[in-house]
Amino acid sequence: MRVGVLGAKGKVGATMVQAVEAADDLTFTTGVDAGDPLSALVDTRTDVVIDFTHPSVVMDNLKFLIDNGIHAVVGTTGFTDERISQVQDWLADKPESAVLIAPNFAIGAVLSMHFAQQAARFFESVEVIELHHPHKADAPSGTAARTAKLIAAARKDMPPNPDATSTGLEGARGADVDGIPVHSIRLAGLVAHQEVLFGTQGETLTIRHDSLDRTSFVPGVLLAVRKVSERPGLSVGIEPLLDLT
């Protein structure tokens, strides 16, 4: 399988280039960065592209890849419901193309989201705290937003979080994602971390995941690269690849 990387000179992208080059069953074709022509992916007969770029360019990248029949594994964040809908519309005209978008490729992070979804209905209160390096463009993170949505869906028949706050500074209680408070921290020295805090009578439960290095994303990305062509259309998350759905 011939694999290219968009954002190849970025910190995550460079890690992905090394991972593809080290894999015996994959061939690295080309790396594309800002200012480079996307046509290089076609010229090198690339089968699958790994995209770790920026929310401002990822949609143009996807339109090009879909139009040219190149499968995409996307770790770039910033996907709103509207963006997801747009990708689905593009894919409707290219039924042979496959796009997999995941808010997080770290296996532990995916498992922590799954565990949080399972725990959600057993606790009265829940809040999410995500912590990242200060260069991250979006807040809350895609992982935190997805975690909150999964928790909210699991709690759909439960009362809302108890919270008597009536006054306070704007933003002090975090962002509201489907009724779940999500707090974002940006701090030098961090990579990617998340805590989900549950509370009920007499006890609390914390589910925490830490990506200490960007290589934590490699196993999930390579799994997606190897499997994406088997799932035409749009897939969100790698949970199905791990038999978690």
Swiss-Prot record:
List of residues binding (S)-2,3,4,5-tetrahydrodipicolinate: 133, 142-143
Pathway stated in the Swiss-Prot or TrEMBL entry: Amino-acid biosynthesis; L-lysine biosynthesis via DAP pathway; (S)-tetrahydrodipicolinate from L-aspartate: step 4/4
Keywords: Amino-acid biosynthesis, Cytoplasm, Diaminopimelate biosynthesis, Lysine biosynthesis, NAD, NADP, Oxidoreductase
Family: Belongs to the DapB family.
Function: Catalyzes the conversion of 4-hydroxy-tetrahydrodipicolinate (HTPA) to tetrahydrodipicolinate.
Catalytic activities: (S)-2,3,4,5-tetrahydrodipicolinate + NAD(+) + H2O = (2S,4S)-4-hydroxy-2,3,4,5-tetrahydrodipicolinate + NADH + H(+); (S)-2,3,4,5-tetrahydrodipicolinate + NADP(+) + H2O = (2S,4S)-4-hydroxy-2,3,4,5-tetrahydrodipicolinate + NADPH + H(+)
GO biological process, one term: lysine biosynthetic process via diaminopimelate
Membrane-spanning residues: none
EC category: oxidoreductase
Cellular localization per UniProt: Cytoplasm
Binding site for NAD(+): 7-12, 75-77, 102-105
Name this polypeptide is given: 4-hydroxy-tetrahydrodipicolinate reductase
Annotated catalytic residues: 132 (proton donor/acceptor), 136 (proton donor)
EC nos: 1.17.1.8
Gene Ontology MF terms: 4-hydroxy-tetrahydrodipicolinate reductase; NAD binding; NADP binding; oxidoreductase activity, acting on CH or CH2 groups, NAD or NADP as acceptor
CC annotations in GO: cytosol
InterPro entries the UniProt entry points to: DapB_C (IPR022663), DapB_N (IPR000846), DapB_N_CS (IPR022664), DHDPR_bac (IPR023940), NAD(P)-bd_dom_sf (IPR036291)
